[in-house]
Regions:
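Short hydrophobic/aromatic beta-strand immediately N-terminal to the Walker A/P-loop
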Residues: 12-14
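P-loop (Walker A) phosphate-binding loop of NTP-binding proteins
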Residues: 16-18
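Walker A/P-loop
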Residues: 24
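Post-Walker A helix-loop "phosphate-sensing" segment adjacent to the P-loop in P-loop NTPases
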Residues: 32-42
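ATP-dependent small-molecule kinase phosphotransfer cores
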Residues: 46-102, 106-108
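Conserved phosphate-donor/acceptor-positioning beta-strand/loop module used by diverse small-molecule
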Residues: 103-107, 118-141
């Protein structure tokens, strides 16, 4: 009986950065891409925010349904930030076991837990943006109040100072094409 050859485990590329840094735009630009001959998987996020609320294309859940999914083990990763619950489905573990590269929209504050869970399979990538540009992007999308925007900028300053120089960093103040090339080069390198 022949033994099936197991593929190398894929890498989990953990994209993080402040609201308004352009993570969702980068994720969309990477959809359908191949990296090192493998299809790049983009993991959907489950969020306790109504669908169509601007910005990120996500799967909307009520807090009660989110809790049930946590209790059922439906999330590979989950966290709270900015008054919402966020989750990444367990399908990412299947994709990684198949050897596929997987790109997720993660959380800076949840990074340590993600590193503990995925170890060397996780590649943190920080997306940075000038704080004035971040503020303008948040105003333009019209989802947050001024107070919420101020709180997000303050959180960005705290977390960016702590994380920016520890990981691969994309400065997303220029063209989308340039930032996407940076991201795909980081992924291709691993």
């Amino acid at each position: 009986m022949a033994t099936a050859i197991q593929p190398d485990r894929g890498c989990l590329f953990y994209l993080m950065g402040p609201s308004g840094a352009g993570k969702d735009t980068l994720l969309d630009a990477c959809r359908g891409q191949e990296v090192s001959g493998r299809h790049l998987r983009i993991a959907p996020r489950y969020i306790t925010r109504r669908a169509g609320s601007g910005g990120e294309d996500h799967i909307a859940l009520t807090p009660a349904v989110f809790r049930v999914r946590v209790d059922n083990g439906d999330f590979a990763l989950h966290w709270r930030a900015n008054g919402r619950c966020y989750g990444i489905g367990v399908e990412v573990d299947r994709w990684l076991a198949n050897g596929d590269p997987v790109l997720v929209n993660g959380s800076r504050a949840h990074l340590d837990e993600a590193l503990t869970q995925y170890g060397d399979s996780l590649v943190p990538i920080m997306v940075c943006v000038d704080f004035d540009r971040q503020r303008q992007r948040l105003l333009d999308r019209g989802r947050e109040t001024i107070e919420e925007i101020d709180a997000r900028i303050a959180r960005s300053r705290r977390l960016q100072a702590r994380l920016e120089h520890r990981f691969a960093t994309i400065h997303n103040d220029g063209s989308l094409t340039h930032a996407t090339r940076q991201l795909l080069a980081i992924i291709d390198h691993h």
